[in-house]
Amino acid sequence: MALLDPHYPLGRHNTFRFEAAARYAAHVRAAQDIAEALTDPRARGLPVLVLGGGSNIVLTRDFDGLVLLMEIPGVQVGRATLDGRAVHTVTAGAGESWHGLVARTVADGLPGLENLALIPGTVGAAPIQNIGAYGVEIKDRFHSLRAYDRHAGEFVTLDAADCAFGYRDSLFKRAGADRYVIAEVTFALPVDWQPDTHYAELARELAARDIAAPAAQDIFDAVVAIRRRKLPDPAEIGNAGSFFKNPIVDTATRDALLARFPGLVGYAQPDGSYKLAAGWMIDQCGFKGRQSGAVGVYDKQALVLVHRGGGSAVQLMTLAREIQDTVHARFGVRIEPEPVVI
């Protein structure tokens, strides 16, 4: 049963480690706890915030509402046919560690998620952000999810089309933001798995390891090594991973920028557009390694903003806006934050 805790501190529940508090919080350890918490008379009419690992949120203030702390455990494996192909289905509770799930599936001989290793957070948050890394996104491995529909007052199952996935985007960041609370997610991992190593940085890492025909474990190990070199451990330095999305532009914009900036880093997309490396642009503007009081830009990866303790989310967002404005002034491209800002 979900009990509401008043005046609940959230410092331990966000990876930036910013201090904030919720009017009420409920530890959700089973699907039915969602409905119980939401129908508690004390929560009636209050805004609701769902928190998993807190790795994709910036808390700039106290939250005057109900926070659902998602802790639903459990992993189940099965088989199914999806679009005419055989898949392993892996259903995980929203509170399961994302990296823990990836490590478990790879170790159990269920490849498909290895490119997404070491991304912080929980399973329930993964489809909201359509997390992605090294050439693979959640949408590529998604089967369905079960969520509580706050409008209907019941649990529903949503497939990939329902979720309307986009680049670091989904239904749950738009029209469904205040409607659905994800309880569990089912992934479809191909039985006829083939390694996805087209991402240049991953290919270089595998080549450096003299691995020409990688197994899923090889890709997992390579991704973990790359991420550990580039990204700070949230347990040591407050951060939310990549803070800015890589902007997507049309071919004409990319060509015009390339003429002015020959070193521009960009990646062709299937629809003919280009995804530009926001980290490269931030670095070119001189922000990499810059510290502004207790917040700053990580010295090994310009996409990452950090909080070294004792600072505030307001300071962080001031720095973020300065970076956005400077990049826009120089390149004419607007970069947008990945985390949700409260």
Swiss-Prot record:
Q: Which domain of life is it from?
A: Bacteria
UniProt keywords (A-Z) are:
Cell cycle, Cell division, Cell shape, Cell wall biogenesis/degradation, Cytoplasm, FAD, Flavoprotein, NADP, Oxidoreductase, Peptidoglycan synthesis
Tell me a GO cellular component: cytosol
- An example Gene Ontology molecular-function term: UDP-N-acetylmuramate dehydrogenase activity
Q: What is its EC number?
A: 1.3.1.98
- EC main group: oxidoreductase
Q: Which Gene3D superfamilies match?
A: 3.30.465.10, UDP-N-acetylenolpyruvoylglucosamine reductase, C-terminal domain, Uridine Diphospho-n-acetylenolpyruvylglucosamine Reductase, domain 2
Cofactors required: FAD
Q: Which InterPro entries match?
A: FAD-bd_PCMH, FAD-bd_PCMH-like_sf, FAD-bd_PCMH_sub1, FAD-bd_PCMH_sub2, MurB, MurB_C, MurB_C_sf, Oxid_FAD_bind_N
Q: Kindly list the cysteine pairs connected by disulfide bridges.
A: none
* Active site as annotated: 168, 242 (proton donor), 338
Q: Which residues form the FAD-binding PCMH-type domain?
A: 17-192
Q: Name one GO biological process term.
A: cell wall organization
Q: Does the keyword Cytoplasm apply?
A: yes
Kindly tell me the pathway this chain contributes to: Cell wall biogenesis; peptidoglycan biosynthesis
Pfam families according to UniProt: FAD_binding_4 (PF01565), MurB_C (PF02873)
Key word Cytoplasm present: yes
Give me the reactions it catalyses.
Answer: UDP-N-acetyl-alpha-D-muramate + NADP(+) = UDP-N-acetyl-3-O-(1-carboxyvinyl)-alpha-D-glucosamine + NADPH + H(+)
List where in the cell it is found: Cytoplasm
Q: What family is reported?
A: Belongs to the MurB family.
Q: What is its biological role?
A: Cell wall formation.
Concerning PANTHER family, the annotation shows: UDP-N-ACETYLENOLPYRUVOYLGLUCOSAMINE REDUCTASE
Please report the name of this protein according to its UniProt entry.
UDP-N-acetylenolpyruvoylglucosamine reductase
Question: Which species expresses this protein natively?
Answer: Ralstonia nicotianae (strain ATCC BAA-1114 / GMI1000)
Name of encoding gene: murB
